[in-house]
UniProtKB/Swiss-Prot annotation:
Disulphide bond pairs: 3-31, 5-20, 10-30
CC terms in the record's Gene Ontology section: extracellular region
Any single GO BP term: killing of cells of another organism
InterPro entries: Alpha-defensin_C, Beta/alpha-defensin_C
Protein name: Defensin-3
Organism for this UniProt entry: Papio hamadryas (Hamadryas baboon)
Upper taxonomic lineage: Eukaryota, Metazoa, Chordata, Craniata, Vertebrata
Family: Belongs to the alpha-defensin family.
Function: Has antibacterial activity against the Gram-negative bacterium E.coli and the Gram-positive bacteria L.monocytogenes and S.aureus. Has antifungal activity against C.albicans.
Amino acid sequence: RTCRCRLGRCSRRESYSGSCNINGRIYSLCCR
């Protein structure tokens, strides 16, 4: 499965799987 860090919410077909911290910003880890 593929995961990516997104700023904001995950899309419907993706599931929230954690958080990413990039340059002090919090992103959502979204996997599908």
